[in-house]
Structures are given as C-alpha cells and as structure tokens.
Amino acid sequence: MPGKLKVKIVAGRHLPVMDRASDLTDAFVEVKFGNTTFKTDVYLKSLNPQWNSEWFKFEVDDEDLQDEPLQITVLDHDTYSANDAIGKVYIDIDPLLYSEAATVISGWFPIYDTIHGIRGEINVVVKVDLFNDSNRFRQSSCGVKFFCTTSIPKCYRAVVIHGFVEELVVNEDPEYQWIDRIRTPRASNEARQRLISLMSGELQRKIGLKVLEMRGNAVVGYLQCFDLEGESGLVVRAIGTACTLDKLSSPAAFLPACSSPSRELKEIPFNEDPNPNTHSSGPSTPLKNQTYSFSPSKSYSRQSSSSDTDLSLTPKTGMGSGSAGKEGGPFKALLRQQTQSALEQREFPFLTLTAFPPGLLVHVGGVVSARSVKLLDRIHNPDEPETRDAWWAEIRQEIKSHAKALGCHAVVGYSESTSICEEVCILSASGTAAVLNPRFLQEGTVEGCLEQRIEENLPVGCGFCHIPYDELNMPFPAHLTYCYNCRKQKVPDVLFTTIDLPTDAVVVGKGCLIQARLCRLKKKAQAEANATAISNLLPFMEYEVHTQLMNKLKLKGMNALFGLRIQITVGETMLMGLASATGVYLAALPTPGGIQIAGKTPNDGSYEQHISHMQKRINDTIAKNKELYEITPPEVSEEMIGSPIPEPRQRSRLLRSQSESSDEVTELDLSHGKKDAFVLEIDDTDAMEDVHSLLTDAPPPSGFYSCNTEIMPGINNWTSEIQMFTSVRVVRLSSLNLTNQALNKNFNGLCENLLKSLYFKLRSMTPCCLCHVNFTVSLPEDELIQVTVTAVAITFDKNQALQTTKPHVEKSLQRASTDNEELLQFPLELCSDSLPPHPFPAAKEHLESANSNSGIPAAQRAVTVEKASAMGDGNFRNRSAPPCASPTVGVVKMTPLSFIPGAKITKYLGIINMFFIRETTSLREEGGVSGFLHAFIAEVFAMVRAHVAALGGNAVVSYIMKQCVFMENPSKNQAQCLINVSGDAVVFVRDSDLEVMSSQQPAANCQPSCTGEVTT
C-alpha cells in the first residue's frame, strides 16, 4: 500500500452531560476512514475522559488519502438504547502529504454537532507514512501544494507560471433525496457535510493531476465554490493558477533572474512585495491601464481549442504598435510574438492572481466580463458533468474573445461566480485583459536581449497605464492623452481593473472604497419566462452599475479603480447589483473633469434654481473629497501633454471596424469624450434619484479609511495591530408595494449603516484603515436581504510622514501594543500579540455570545487553542530557540490579507477548506437571527483556529468566507445556515522577534531575510 494512516485518540474535555441521572457521560470514540472503522473503549462517568487509545492504523491508497476525510465521532454509550451522538470532527489529511509541510496533526479539536454546535473538545494525534510510488498511471496528486493567496506566496519564488486550471464535480444533494423525508435533521446535515468534504478532496486531487501534467508543483489563487442547485444537485467547482514554485532557502535566492538587478528586493524575488517597507504590509501588483468593458453574455457552442480559430490570441493587424511610437513598435511586436508562443497551447490563458512578480504585467487592456442565464436541470450522471462544463466553457470563450479584441493575449485577476434562485442560475466571470512578460510563462523562451528591452521599455510607475492597443484602431471610443509621467505613450482618462494596485504605481493622495448599489424589481415567473426576464434586465443593470461607478469616481476626484468586484444576485422578485472597488488618483492619468448637471426644462426658474443648488453641492463635495484624500496633483502644461486623440474622422473609422455590439459602444461613449466635465442629464425622476444618491454617500469619520484591496493606496506606515471581523446583517423588507427607488434607498441605507456601525465599534483604534472589505449580498428568501462583510482593521502611525510617490521607502514602524484593543466596545478577534499578560478578549464580535451556546466559556476556549499549539508554551523572547524558529503565539491569528503586518511568514502548512452546517429548532431561545448567526460564526472561527494550531501554525492568511447561506422559518422557530471558509495555514515570526534572535545569534547562523527555513 502506498500509505499508512495512524490515528491515536488521547482524551476529551468539557463534554456535555448525556446522563441526567448522574450528570455525567459514558463516552467513546469511533474513528472512520473510508470503509474502515475503529472504536475506543468506553470511558465511564466522566466529562473529561482519558482514552489514551492504541494507534489505529489504516492502510489505504494515496488517492483515498486525498479524497477521504478522517471522521471522528464521539458518542455516549447507552446499554438499552441506541448510542447518542455527541458530535463529530472532520480532519483533512492533505496537509500531511507535502514533503515540506507538517509531519503530524496533534491538538485539541472542537467536537461539532450540526444541531447543538460545539460540545467539548477531543485530543487527537494523526500521522501518515507514505511509500514511494512510481506508477505512471496513478490517480493521485500527492505533493502538489495549494494556496488560497492570489499572489506568489512568501518564502517562494515563481520559476514558471503555467496558467489556468479548473475542474468541477457534481452529485446529488442529500438534502433533496427521498430518504431525507424519513431521517433526522442531524443525519441529513451530516450526510451533506460528509459528501461535500469528499467532493472537495476529489476536486483538489483532480486539479493536482492537471498541474502535474503541466509539470507544475503548486496551485496559487485556488478558489473553490459550492453551487447549491436544490433538486438539480450539488456542484463543487474550483479554479486556480498552476505554477512551479521554489522554496527560498538562501540569501542568494533573493536576487532572481526574473527581477531587475537595479530593483532592491527585501523580500522574495517574485514575492508580492518588492517594497522593503511593505514587505510584510503589502503585496506588489504591477497593474496595467484598464478601460472598462461590460459585455452581456452571449451563447456560444462548445468547441475544442484547436478549432477556435476565430478566438486566436494573435492581435489584429497593426494593433499594439500605435501607442509605442517609432521606438515601441518592433519591441511590442517581439514581445507579443514571444508571449503568444508561451500561451498559444492553452485553451484559456487566464490567471487567478491579483498580485504579480515584478515585471510580469506589461500592459492592461481593460476589464472584460461575461454573464449567462441558464435553466438548471437534474444531474443524471454525476460522473459526466458535461452540461456544467459546457456552460463555463462558453463563458470563458467569451472572456477570451473580449481580451483578444482589446489586443491582449491573457486575462489576469480572473474570477467566476454564480447566483441561483429556484431553477435559474446566473453564471458570471470577469477579469482584466493584459499583456504579460513571456519569461515568467515558459522556461528558456526569452532571449537575453528581449529581457533587456523589456526592462528598458517599461517606465517605472506608469508602464502599466499605457494602452496595449493601436490608438488608430481602438476597440472602443476613448479619450487618450500622453502619459503625465513619461510623456511618451498614450494613456486613457480613466482606468478600471480587477487586480490590486502595484507597489511601483505613482499615487497622489490616498484611496477610498467606492461602491455602486442597484436593485431592480421583476415579476415572479417560472422556468424559461423567468430566465428571459432576467436576461433582459442584466444589460441595463450592468450599464447603470457602470454609470454609478464613473459618477462616484469623479465625485471623489480620482481617475482609477482597482480590485473591482461586481455581484449580480437573483431573487424571486428582484435583482440586486453590488460593485466594490478602491478608487485612487494615478499620477500618470489626466486629472478628471468635474460633474456638470443639465436639466431638460431650462425655462422653469425654480427648476433651474434647484439644478444650480445641486451643482454647487456637487462642486463642494468634489473639493472636500480632494482635501480629505490629499489629492493635489502637480500642474502640467498642455503643451507637454499633447492633445487628446482620436479626432472625429479617426473615431468614425474605428467605429466601422468595431466588432462589438452597438450597445457597448454607446455605453462607453457616455464615459469617454473630449469634454472637461462629465455631464449628467436629468430628464426624469430616476436621474434625479441617481444624483441624490451620489450626495448621500457620507465620507468615513475622521481617522478612518477603507478599501477592498489588500493595501490602502497612499499609506505605508502600518503597525502590527490588526483586527479581523465578520458581520452578517439580515433585513426583511416591510412594505409589499416597493418601487425601484424605494428599494434602492433601502439597500443603500443598509450598506451605509453597516459601514457606520463598523466605524463606531472600531472608534478606539483610530487612525486605522479597513482593508480587504468584502461585501457579499444574497437573497435567501422573498423580501429578505442578507449582507455579509468581512474585513480587517489595520492601524497606522499618523505621526510618520507618508510616502506616496516612491515604491521603496524606509522600514515602517512596528508596534505590538494591545492597549487600543482593550478599549474596544466589544472583542473583535480571538487573537493576541506575543505578550501573554494581555491577551485579546474573545474571538471577533462573534465569540462574545458563544459562551451560552457552545457549552465552553470563551476564556476556556482561548486557553484551549493556546494549549493546542504544537509549538510549546512560554514566551518566545524568554526562551532559547533555534534560529528562524516560529514563536509561541497564544491564539491563532486570522486575516483576509496574504501577509501579517510587522511579521514574516516562514512556512506554509497547507490549505484550510471547511464547510459547516448549523440548524436550530429554537431560534428565539438562541437570541433570534442575530444570536444564532453570531454564535455559529464564532464556532466556525474556533474550529478553524483549532485545525491550524494542530498543524503547528499560528495564523490563517488569505482567509475568505466564500459562502454564508441563511434560511429561516419564523413560524416554526427554525433556522439553518451553511458556511464555507478557506485560507492558508502558516507559521509567522514577528520582526521584533527576528531582531532579538539576530542579536543573540551570530549573523552566519541566522539570516533574518530568509525568515524561513524551518526544517521538520
């Protein structure tokens, strides 16, 4: 057998009382893997049993080790009746299958029950012995590493970025099987959890096989999603970017061949952070200029990649030579030829990365998106999911064709999502069309002369802004000017992108969160009629969302959006759209014009006075925003910049060559043109409401900033004080006769009040910034709106001078104080710094109510996780430790960022991908919807932290709550919630601890810059 799994059950504690007569429990444990089950002895009359079982050994294939989870069930022994279930623990074995990962899983795991929540803890030790397997026909992919982070992980360098990998598996949903009518809710929930865990493991294994076929060893930007299609079935799908990664182990590796010798890198060569100041506080993301392009989905028949001649990656004749002038033409042609050779063999040249190694991105062409409305049908054969594959293939082919139309050969920042209601499913995909540097895509394909030309032809701070297409044959009408930085090539007047801001970008002032919110009512319908109505609404919703983004961007006095994420959610009676992005002012782009309001009835005196008043308010708002975000661009004469192009005659020529729909051209005409001001024409009530909504967005309170990217543009002086939080708000619409205007007002108020409540609760942390703000909107029931927000609050030093125009700054100040956290109105995060006397209170805003729901006090749970750590006890600074070892941290930190400010990640232990179901039949007794969700999310955090601590980790980075599906039945006092979370388990070391170690150890024995060879 290629693998032997060994499990030992040590002890349990804080078990619930199962025998009312004695107020004790007769507990035993069943250990199951695959079809084999072992049992421990019954430990009589104790709430803290000590089993100390023998080693249970499972001899299995490595394929099963990847697919199957280890199931540990704790039961109460009953002599005369069936044994009562206390709870279960699912342990993923995959992290033990990496050669450089953990060798043992050991710790206290919360015992989870889908009805009662956490019911005590169990101490388990798991080991795996793998045998060498040289079978060329094997179906396992052991050794392929998975990372949730959408950038090259710390401690690694990218040798080759192979490209896009995807897979999906389907099955019947146990919740909708006939047997569900006769089994208990607990059995149904556990069957669902078990099936999803199996499908998740199978999906990961299949993607790993594809990576091995591409000769890679890792998947970066791994995104797994669950499509709950009801009676149609259950779909688990995932996308990612296949890479070949090398572990950095020596200082010499910090100057790779793929980085410019003149570029000083404090971190890893292809790390997201070439900036020494932000090496732990921000990833590097060379971004390219983007012109926003919404495109409603069209229907394509599935074809093989070899037959897609119309979607070839070869740009149109002349495309790519105009903007570079006489010098850039031959260079761009050579670059495209080299890059195309590396990509032409790939069916979909997509990357799920949003942050990139320095020099990978050459140009960005625009945001490309596609949507399609489908009718769900029952999955007849789970082993052959051709229908769903064909759906996604159509979407990807359309994205590919849009990128080609923009003169680009790749799509970066690519993501996919679905929205399902009854029988209708909306498939959505979006990304950023880009031109990539070929040396990252294939080994040995780029000659040295081309590498030199690439570095010479990319101006620092503005190269990504230059248009990749021919200015005389543009794919859409646009207003171009010469770059305000290098003054050699053309840039657009506005830039939209789905990726993060590059560290070398020259930004004026600070950034801010910009959101566009939209609701549209629709009639109730069934099947095809419903799908048709949704299809007809989608283009208009996309147009209005785009218009809102443009208006709000200009109202802020900014000219670029990064991290754009658009959601279209479908319900029974409405459609909702939510777009989030981070607005910035790029110095390379022209100063945005103002907003001018024009009315339809100029003879009406009172109406003109009203218009004039609104115009004054808008002008005042723009001036205040420029002052608030410190936007003071340097003045540049018009003679140095050049006149805008194209001229009207050239524009008519490009319109004739335009192959896209006339609707898209009209949409872009509204946002581009040779006018100093952006004109808003008020011709009806809806237009008036749009203008009012622009003015009702209140700025954040003094000392607060917010963004949906990892790093707030314009701020570099981060401290080590972070607080992650999740907030879920469910609102039931009261009125049955809502109009679109009233619905929009309610939705805007819901989102604004949610942000205001966060600012209020975090008021003692000022000055701080809410980073990686992730809004998710769903319509679980008719007239029910659910908004979920995940973000992290990071403090910064307001006394340190901000350096916004240089990508490389001095080392940022680091602070490990927890004083502000003690002053919080409520505990936000169950995490602490390395100071044992001052632990953080409880886990997030959610562990506060976990005391009465989980059976374990929050204080005890904090101690539980601390003792579960496999790294020992005590203060790291006061004990002797080997160089570059990981510190002892009392509680596992959680953050949606790919880094931890003021610290270095030394080791990745594996991916955490967990799915939980919680159901209750006593909703009111548990505090209603708020109390139920509050306790459940707290329990999810506790279980995630326990699994990370058992692996020997002390943090979860790139954390994301991908799904939070809530359903309630108030009349029956019932509720159910499904949550899917994922992230990367890591070991990190504080920079202050590294300094202590470097002072105690000889320089030859400890390399702080390597931070990370921990041998196991």
Curated annotation (Swiss-Prot):
CDD domains, A to Z: C2_KIAA0528-like
Cofactor: Ca(2+)
C2 domain segment(s): 1-109
Span list, region Disordered: 265-330, 636-668
PTM annotation, UniProt: Phosphorylated on Ser-197 by active myristoylated kinase AKT2; insulin-stimulated phosphorylation by AKT2 regulates SLC2A4/GLUT4 translocation into the plasma membrane.
PTM annotation (Phosphoserine): residues: 197, 200, 260, 293, 295, 304-306, 323, 643, 657, 659, 661-662, 671, 817, 869
Residues with Phosphothreonine modification: T317, T601, T666
Pfam families linked to this entry: C2, YbjQ_2, YbjQ_3
UniProt binding sites for Ca(2+) 3: D78, S81, D84
Location within or outside the cell: Cytoplasmic vesicle membrane; Cytoplasm, Cell cortex; Cell membrane; Cell projection, Ruffle
Positions with biased composition (Polar residues): 274-289
Low complexity biased stretches: 290-318
Binding site for Ca(2+) 2: D19, D76, D78, D84
Organism domain of life: Eukaryota
PANTHER family for this protein: C2 DOMAIN-CONTAINING PROTEIN 5 (PTHR37412:SF2)
Protein name (record): C2 domain-containing protein 5
The organism of origin for this protein: Mus musculus
